[in-house]
């Protein structure tokens, strides 16, 4: 009889870990966003900048993969508790600020990217892919929140869409 309790205890610990797993994914995405932001901010442009585009592209791809992995984590999670929801809300606020800052840096650096001709179109493609992945991640996380918090969460993440739309519109001007 003692063994029959063990699977239930393991299941309970798995559900408790879901909030932590989503938070870990958000932390990873925030760190990748911050790293990319720093690399883009240090971009010099011109021929010197050509070599600097490789780390930008690698970090951008890493960020995209982290977002996709975060979506898988959120999709696999059970509904979050109220306490987990509060923690996710705090992490979301930090992530929104980081994404907005990064996208502002990307927009500000566009003239330097334009000098290299081929870089701005690649950045545009990356922005569109990251926006799509971010939308999926956001929807997956919001779906795991208790119903009464979902509309609030959608309001918290709305500035990300605005920032992406602005950055994408700026990069579309290249064509």
Model-derived features: positions:
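Fungal secretory targeting signals
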Residues: 1-20
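Mature, structured extracellular domains of secreted fungal proteins
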Residues: 18-175
